[in-house]
Amino acid sequence: MAFSKQFPETTRRSFLKGAGAVSAAAVTGAAVGGFPIPAIAQAQEVTMISAENNGAALDALKAIAAGFTKESGVNVVINNMDHEAHKTAIRNYLVAGAPDVCSWFSGNRMRAFVKRGLFDDISDLFEKEKYKDVLGATAGAVTEDGKQYGLPTGGTLWGMFYRKDVFEQHGLTVPKTAEDFMAYGDKCKAAGITPIAIGTKELWPAAGWFDQMNLRINGLDKHMALMNGEMSYLDPSLTDVFDQWEAMIGKGFFTPNHTSFGWQEAAALLAQKKAGMMNLGAFLRSAFTEADLPQLAYATFPVLDAKVGHFEEFSVNSIHIPAKAKNKQGARDFLAYFYRPENLAAYLEPGGNVPPRHDLPPSKDPLVNVAVETMKTVQGTSQYYDRDSDPDMAQAGLVGFQEFMAKPDRRKAVLTRLEGTRKRIYKI
């Protein structure tokens, strides 16, 4: 028997998904991550805390849970949280009141909890289900010291999104080089539309723009050296990045007053034909009506240095078993069921996520299939500034990049401050 309960949802922004509902088979008894669960038959349950704010994807997750219950007789309790609130809550519930399964991020975000002994090693599940055979290089996103601590779920390929009809109306072409981009921006300005929609109220979109430029000017190795605290924010190799970025700001290529816009509000400008392009993930589709979605197209960020290889920003979400989970075997059984190709595909489809398994059927979403094809030519990937960096360094960087975009004359002060933060965090 399943129960349903609505939990208050915070009003903070959703990162990768649109708004959704909350489901739980929880009424009374012990607490998991701050949520009550039944005192009776807890051993026959698998508890999960998710951060799924896309309503259709959450419905798919509920359906998968129901299918698992029907097949195994084990009930799945899903407590869904706001995406942003979950980033704080997980730091508490992994220590006390852990669920059996939780959603999170792969890469450095995962490793921070692995180093603290808060995620369970599920290498046995990988071996049993032969996941390495179907994941290929993506398995590395959840691997630390040769062991696997989660399953990669959906990936987001970041890039330049635009409306095909807007490009046709104004005679615009997708910029392939730095020169193309500047010409594109000038043409947009002449047509009365903003070249690049961006909202930096939530900080991270500015860091995403930095990532794209740094990857294309300095390459992946130097970019990751900066992310890992091994390179100075005053390094001369970053001069060209900020010179070109400052030139774009000076020409008025970005949304005016962007610090007052959230990413969803900025995406609405793209949907409303008030901007030409936007650097984001396919989740910006939530700003478009169903009728307008066929107009949405993807392009890679322009090449800024032809000598630099093809690197992209590709962030991967993941699902984990906390080290303090009470029903670890039940959690493994549920993950194996959830990760079946047909189930994972049903979960990923609503959000336009790129599948981590190569044995899933083609998506109904052409943007996803374009992303899959793009990834075949990529020489390496980063995840995203705030996923690749130390959390404290990331927060300082997010604030700094927004400040630079709003007040480019503060560039030297911003970079000097970031360098001081780097030295403090990495004890240099």
Functional labels for PLM-detected ranges:
Residues A63, G67-V134, T143, D165-K176, ...:
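Extracytoplasmic "Venus flytrap"/periplasmic binding protein-like
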Residues Y149-T153, W158, M182-E230, A275:
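Extracytoplasmic/periplasmic solute-binding protein
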Residues F105-G159, M182, W209-D211, S237, ...:
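Hinge/lid segment of periplasmic solute-binding proteins
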Residues G140-A141, A299, L348-A396, E403, ...:
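Long, aromatic- and glycine/proline-rich binding clefts that accommodate carbohydrate-like moieties
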Residues G185-K187, M227-H258:
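Glycine-centered hinge/linker elements that transmit conformational signals in sensory
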Residues M1-S14, S23-G29, I37:
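N-terminal secretory signal peptides
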Residues A51, I64, R111, D243-N327:
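Extracytoplasmic/periplasmic substrate-binding proteins
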Residues F3, K70, E168, T377-I428:
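Conserved C-terminal helix/tail region of periplasmic/extracytoplasmic solute-binding proteins
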